[in-house]
Amino acid sequence: MHTVGSIQTEALSRLSSLYTREEARSLVRILLEEILSISRTQLFMASESPLDEGQEEQFWEAVERLLHHEPIQYILGHAPFGALDLFVAPGVLIPRPETEELCATIVERHRGQKGLHILDLGTGSGCIALYLAQMLPQAEVFALEKSDQAVAIAQRNFDRSGLGSSTPQLLRGDMLEVGSWASSLPPLDIIVSNPPYIQPTEAVTMEPHVLEHEPHLALFAPESDPLLFYRAIYQLAARLPMQPSAHIYLELNALLAEDTLAVFTEAPHIYSATLLPDLSGKSRFLTATLTP
């Protein structure tokens, strides 16, 4: 039977071939806090405490998965997003801080407005829809998804959200076409999406834990048409029931920011479109307003 301190030392040694020492320390700490159900302060004080056989087995299984580049969020089965703790699995993207920035922008701009109707296109884990439903409780939020795995994961997150009547409504369908999913939508005030936007040629620069484990369907745009989903979104805005001067909020590929902006500034039903920076200063988001 090993102590917390001894397995920390051994795990850091094993992980050092793939991760920086700081990354490895963080991963080991998170695993131990989860497995032992203790806080960071308690972990610091538990260096000489022994692990039981089950805890040790669980820990080394997780370390082995880390050595195969598996994201720790998939290993743990959950990920934070704002004040939410979301179930995640390989069928959905792991929620990113940039996406949380986009959600915070929407909340800041629309807080206090009542009767909002919001559509999240390609909801994945449901992170955007749930964040907005939680922070804008007077809004009615709809979430569209086509992937079987993602639908199941989003529904699980919706069911456990505790939001009651504010829980998003999950719609099954494809954002590339207006199907039966659109028939029950009220006039929308906001469309939001974090669609696939990575170009396949960018794969060589991506971290193995993303490239080897997260769903390519949600990551990559078609090589022949990297702005496919953005054109589809502005076309949806022309075909779905929309309020006058409704808003569109999108996460995008900073390498294609100007091209993405051009898609919207050239659309006849778009009154205005603007790029917004993320916290690192990159053009990461687009906001557009429909004609009044």
Model regions and ranges:
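Non-catalytic accessory regions of SAM-dependent methyltransferases
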Residues: 1-43, 48
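Conserved RecA-like P-loop NTPase ATPase core
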Residues: 31, 158, 194, 210, ...
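Conserved AdoMet
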Residues: 32-108
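Conserved SAM/SAH cofactor-binding pocket of Class I
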Residues: 98-205, 232
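C-terminal beta-strand of the catalytic ATP-binding
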Residues: 197, 289-292
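Mobile active-site "lid"/loop adjacent to the S-adenosyl-L-methionine
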Residues: 197-229
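Conserved Class I SAM-dependent methyltransferase catalytic core
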Residues: 223-289
